[in-house]
C-alpha cells in the first residue's frame, strides 16, 4: 500500500515542498539538476524540443530609471535562444496575468537593440506554476492553459514569439492510484504532494523522478538549508491550519446564525398564521 501521509499537523517531513522558492531552485535551477528542468520544460512546451539550456541572472532592471524592476524565480535560455521565465506562486495575487505580461516585456526589450532596423526577437515563454485557481479561468478544467496573441474573430495567430502558460495545481485531482505514468501529471502530483510523501511512488518510473526525490529529501541538504526549509514548511503548515480553523469557525457561526434566524422566522410565521385564523373567525383587528 502506497504511503501518503495526510496528517497536516505532523512536522516530521521527509521531503521538502517543491513550491518553496529555495527548494524549487535546488531541484530545477542548478547545473547539476539541469536535466530536471529540461525534462519539465519539454513536457510543458511539447512543440519546442529543448536539448540544453543556460541559467541566467534572475534580476531584471528596468530600461527607465523610475520603472519597476523584477526578480524571476527562474530564468533560462535554451539552446535555440528562446527565453523562458518560470514563476512559482503559492498564494493568489491581484492582477497576476498582468504581472506575467509585464515580466515578458523585459526579455523582449533586451533582445531588440537600440537603433536596430527590425523588432525581431526570439520566443519568450512565461511559465506560471500556481497553487490557486485564476479568476476568469475557474470553469476551465484543464490544469495547463496556454495563451498567445490571436485575432479575435478568425483566431489567427498574430505571432508565436510570446507565450504565457499557467499551471493551476488545484485543478489536478488525480490520486496516486489514478496516475498512469504520464510524466507531466507525475510532476503535477509531486508539486502538490511532495511534502507529505514518504517515498517515491512506484508509478513514477521516469528517471527524472529519482533525482527529484533525491534532491528534495531534507537529509540530503546541508544543515543551514535544511533548517531554513523546515522552518518555512512548518510556518506554512501552521498558517494553513489556522486558515482551515478560521474557515470552520466561520461555517459554524454561520450555521448558528442560520438556526437562530430560522427560529425567529418560524415564530413570526406562526404568529401570522394565528392572526389570520383569528380574523377568519370574525374577531376584530383591534382584538387580534
Residue ranges of each PLM-predicted region?
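Short, charged alpha-helical interaction segments and adjacent helix-coil junctions
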Residues: 2-13, 84-89, 189-287
